[in-house]
Structures are given as structure tokens and as C-alpha cells.
Amino acid sequence: MVEKRIQPLARDAMAYVLAGGRGSRLKELTDRRAKPAVYFGGKARIIDFALSNALNSGIRRIGVATQYKAHSLIRHMQRGWNFFRPERNESFDILPASQRVSETQWYEGTADAVYQNIDIIEDYGVEYMVILAGDHVYKMDYEWMLQQHVDSGADVTIGCLEVPRMEATGFGVMHVNDKDEILAFVEKPADPPGIPDKPDFALASMGIYVFHTKFLLDALRRDAADPNSSRDFGKDIIPYIVQNGKAVAHRFAKSCVRSDFEHEPYWRDVGTIDAYWQANIDLTAIVPELDIYDKSWPIWTYAEITPPAKFVHDDEDRRGSATSSVVSGDCIISGASLNKSLLFTGVRANSFSKLEGAVILPNVKIGRRAQLKNVVIDHGVVIPEGLVVGEDPELDAKRFRRTESGICLITQPMIDKLDI
């Protein structure tokens, strides 16, 4: 195995996180927040994974571009990511869309979200730029990708996942040679090209790019001058470099961080209600696919000060209990029973209620005798006494956002419309 350099390249890199997207496939879950600000795993927000990867990789200069409904995201970062110190040559910049180029122009694409802050990037004088999406769940050491970028002499190095070929139709797909040099980049192809050594698999873009800073800024300026550009990395910047420069694929398996319990590289988009529910519920397994308890690669986040979780009542039909579940601080399970559920902070589950396959966001109150199965309940929802979800598909679909696989998203406006 190749060893890391004695002098890490991450020390001379800046991570630039694109966190302005809505995530419309999450429906009402992103009505009040951007997708990167959506809660995940009982404690964190989705963006904490990209930020933690950067920090754990040794990167100490980070910029985060925000746009859509950014208040909760900005507040979270101000509270949880305020420990960077300029006197140690560290920085953490929150970069909201602010019409820095013209009085009528917000961020018009992923590339434009970087271009509009070129002066800030130049001020830091870093050698390398690591462009990241702020809405994926994974653990990755970017130092390995930086090292491959330098060793290969590439103009851009693109993080890629190996996925079954016919599942790659929703991704940007790399056609590579046996050296993983990218010959073509195809956006959402009907017939994805296979990998030379694994023809039944394709290399799908993770939306992670490494550049030498000067090359990137020159490419952004050239793109900004093109009136036909959509100002997007995947649609404009990357295809141009593939055709006119040298682009190299970096396989995620080479830099994925895995504990002793994680056997396969883990990366999730969690961009749909089903995917979001499944990724959270997976954490309740005895040996989950994603190890969030790995102290060698912590997921940093805002550490809210809360009292411990509490379980009360021990009668035959009224026992506060949880099996195969994750329960966060400040939760009180008062005579309720949980199975295969994940609760964020401040949840109150009252007597005789039963939760199974439930993802409960912070500060939810669950009334007595509620029966909730396969649900995602948004922040602060008050579940009325006796509400039953998960038994009558037709009724659930009328009341809530129900997916084809039977997962129900419940928000307070939906509850307010109930006639019960």
C-alpha cells in the first residue's frame, strides 16, 4: 500500500463545501432548511460529514457556500464549527450568496458559487482546492485523493464510486482507461460505460473534485466569460477539462475510512425520504454499515448540552423500553415502547405509545397510545393522542407524505389538518 507523505498535502489545501441546495426530493423535510442542514444519525446534520472529513484529513481552511433557506445551516455552523483559530493559520468561512458579482446575480450554479468568491480563495494562497458536496453521508480521508492528484499530474481529480452499471443512470459517469484517466464524462447516461477491470460496474461521480488552485481559478474565469455556460461543475467545468486537459478518477475505496466493523465503502446520498429513513434506521443494527462510534474518525457537530435520556414506568402494560434503537440525550420514554427506532434530542414519548421503524427529529412530543410505524417525524411536531400511522396505507396517504415503499413523512402542518 502506498504510504502518505511525511508532509501532508492537506496542510496546503482549502475545502470548499457547496451547501446551497434544497434537496427537493426530500419534500416537506426541506421546506424550512437546506438539505445539508437536515438532521442525521441522532445528533449531527448531513453537512457535518463533509466538514468532519475535511478536518480529520488535516485541512484547516474551509469555506461553505450557502443559498437556499440557509438560516438553520448557518446557525448550526456558527455554534458547532466555531473552533478554528486564525492565529493557527486556520479559517472557517460561511459564504452566503450575496450578489458579489452583480446586484441581480445570486449563485447560478455550483461553479458560480465558487467563482463569486475567487477573491477570498486567492487571499488564502493555498496550493490545492478540494471541492465538496455538503449533502452526502460518508467517511473519507481527502489526503489520499490529494496525493493521487499530485502524483498523476492531473488538472482535476474526481472522486468516484464503483456502482453496478445499470444503477449508474442517475449519476455523472466516467469512462476511464486502465490507468483511471478519464476519457469521457457522461451525465446520467442510458447505457453507462463499464470499468475496464470490472465491466459490470461503472464509475459514478461523487461530486468531489481536487484542483491546483491556479488551474481552478483560471477555469472558473473562462467559464464565467462563456454566455452559453450553465455555471456548473458537472455540466461545464468537468467536461471541458476532460476534452482539453487531463482528468483522473479517484476510486472511493482507496480513501474510504473504515473501522474494523465496516466491511464495504459506505456512501449515501439520502436524497429521498426512503433513502433518508433507511440510512438512519440502519444505524440501529447490531453492526451497522456506517460506524458513527469510530473515535479515530469522529463526526464533529454542535454538542448541545442536554441531560441524559430517561426511561420511566415498569408496569406490565406500561413500560418505558427500547430495543435495537438509538436514543439521544434529553429524551424521556415515559411508559412507551420503541423498536428499531432512532430518536434525536428532546423527544417525549408518552404512555402506551409504540414506535417501530421511527426516525424522530428533535423536540417531538408523542401523545399517549400513539402507534407509529415506518415514519419520519419532523422537528417539533406534536403527535396527538391515539394517532395510528402504518396500518392503513390509503388513510396514511391522504393524511401524510407516504412513499411507495410505505414510509410516512409527518410534519406539523399535516397534523394541524387532521380531523381527529
Curated annotation (Swiss-Prot):
Binding residue positions for alpha-D-glucose 1-phosphate: 107, 172, 187-188, 205
PROSITE patterns linked: ADP_GLC_PYROPHOSPH_1, ADP_GLC_PYROPHOSPH_2, ADP_GLC_PYROPHOSPH_3
Entries under Gene3D superfamilies matching the protein: Hexapeptide repeat proteins (2.160.10.10), Spore Coat Polysaccharide Biosynthesis Protein SpsA, Chain A (3.90.550.10)
Keyword field contains Nucleotidyltransferase: yes
InterPro entries the record matches: ADP-Glc_PPase, ADP_Glu_pyroP_CS, GlgC_bac, GlmU/GlgC-like_hexapep, NTP_transferase_dom, Nucleotide-diphossugar_trans, Trimer_LpxA-like_sf
Keywords: ATP-binding, Carbohydrate metabolism, Glycogen biosynthesis, Glycogen metabolism, Nucleotide-binding, Nucleotidyltransferase, Transferase
GO MF annotations in UniProt: ATP binding; glucose-1-phosphate adenylyltransferase activity
Catalytic activities: alpha-D-glucose 1-phosphate + ATP + H(+) = ADP-alpha-D-glucose + diphosphate
Enzyme nomenclature, EC number: 2.7.7.27
A GO biological process held by the record: glycogen biosynthetic process
Keyword Protein transport: no
Database matches in Pfam families: Hexapep_GlmU, NTP_transferase
The protein's annotated pathway: Glycan biosynthesis; glycogen biosynthesis
NCBIfam families: glgC (TIGR02091), PRK00725.1 (NF001947), PRK00844.1 (NF002023)
Subunit and interaction comment: Homotetramer.
Function: Involved in the biosynthesis of ADP-glucose, a building block required for the elongation reactions to produce glycogen. Catalyzes the reaction between ATP and alpha-D-glucose 1-phosphate (G1P) to produce pyrophosphate and ADP-Glc.
HAMAP family referenced in this protein's UniProt entry, alphabetically: GlgC (MF_00624)
Similarity comment: family membership: Belongs to the bacterial/plant glucose-1-phosphate adenylyltransferase family.
Protein name: Glucose-1-phosphate adenylyltransferase
Organism: Rhizobium etli (strain CIAT 652)
